């Protein structure tokens, strides 16, 4: 069933968290009846599939979550992943100024357990952290366990930003984590199979960046003079055939109708790269084949994507800044088709 932007906005306002006793909790009149929408308002959507049901997680207080059986009608879960937005204390210690508004989660099933990574940060700074949760089933909304911090960055120590995590498992069954936004671009590190934390002795390596392009007309990050013109973030790796495909988002999100977000892609036969675009350019040196951008009619801009092989095919998801909805960020879903030479096209 369709629900207007006004009604949905009002319902979400009713369920909005309020500050009490130093933490954010759901208001007493929080939403009780489920709301079902066919075009949910989201930022940074990721998905998982379990027992005939799709689970969507995205940026929001306590990590916003929704469920669906057909990816057409989404039930908004009134409670975030973190019950009553009770975020682990370590997040506030690691990231001064961080609130309960969590960015860009990712979710994966590994060795009979679900893992969810999430971003803790503040705009324009790279003092950030990526947290980890675990659960035995996505249907157990109260079953998420805090597994602590995966990686963290500090502005006076690191030239990368610990946000926008993405898990990938290689052909040998080894888990890896990618992340990054601005600064020195997209990072990658190997994880331990037993703990899903960083493997002992592993070091981050850069697998994609923008500033090497040397584009003098590139727009600087308006929120931080230190982030430079390296407008790349939101990595997501999908394995298909004999290749790993690295999706990244270029340019700027979060400006509504003034956003210019877009998605680029490269591929590699090795999970750690090098990732090359269609022209053979290394993504570490500014390469990347443009895959998706706004058409200025339906969407002004689109970005921060994820991609999956589901029972009915391969699909690509992102958020798009809707022109008819005056720049509101909504869920975009596109079917993936593969060319004979192993590149993808979006319907």
What would you call each of these model-derived segments?
Residues 11-14, 201:
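Repetitive helical segments and hydrophobic/amphipathic motifs
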Residues 2-9, 20:
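Sec-dependent signal peptide recognition
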Residues 3, 22-347:
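Carbohydrate-active catalytic/glycan-binding domains of CAZyme proteins
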Residues 9-10, 346:
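Generic detector of low-complexity/intrinsically disordered segments
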Residues 15-22:
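C-terminal segment of classical bacterial N-terminal signal peptides
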Residues 10-11, 39:
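Hydrophobic residues within membrane-embedded alpha helices
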